[in-house]
Amino acid sequence: LWWRLDKKLTLEDCYYSAMLPLIDAIKRGTTTLIDHHASPFAARASLDKIAEAVKKAGLRASLCYEVSDRDGSKTARDGIDENVEFIKRCQEEKDENLKALFGLHASFTITDGTMEKASEEGRKLGAGFHVHTAEAASDQDYNEKNFSMRVVERLDKFRILGPKTI
C-alpha cells in the first residue's frame, strides 16, 4: 500500500505529509523524530521540504531518504544523491536540531551495485545509516536465495553496520 502512495507524492505533499505527524508529535510531547522518507518521483529536495516543516514545528529530527531499486536505477541514484546533498547541507549548517543519516529502504529492495554506491557515499561523508533490517522472514529468505547470506551479513559485507547505524 505505502509504495503506491509514495509514488504519487509531490514536493508540496512531502511538506504536508511531514507537518501532520509533527503536529501530532507536539500534542503527544515528542520532541525528536527520526524519519525514513520515500517519494521516488519527487526525491530531489524532498528532505529540504521535510526539514522546513520540522523547523516550522520547532522540533528536532534526524532525516534521511530511503534508497531503493524498486522503481529502477535512476530513482535509486536520485535517492543516493538526495541523501548526499542533504547530509552535506546538515554538516555545513551545523543546526543542532536537524541531523541527517544515509537512508536505505531494506536489503531485499537494493541491488549490490546500489548498496555499494550508497555505502561508499555514506562512509565518505562519515554518515550513519538508517535501514530496515530483517523485518520479516521474507527479507531473510530473499537474501539467502539471491545473495547466499542473511540480511545482517549482507549489510556487514557492504560496511553499512556500525555505531551510527539504526
Give the predicted meaning of each segment.
Residues H37, R44-I166:
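Metal-coordinating catalytic core of metallo-dependent amide/deamination hydrolases
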Residues L1-D48:
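Metal-associated gating/positioning segment near the N- to mid-region
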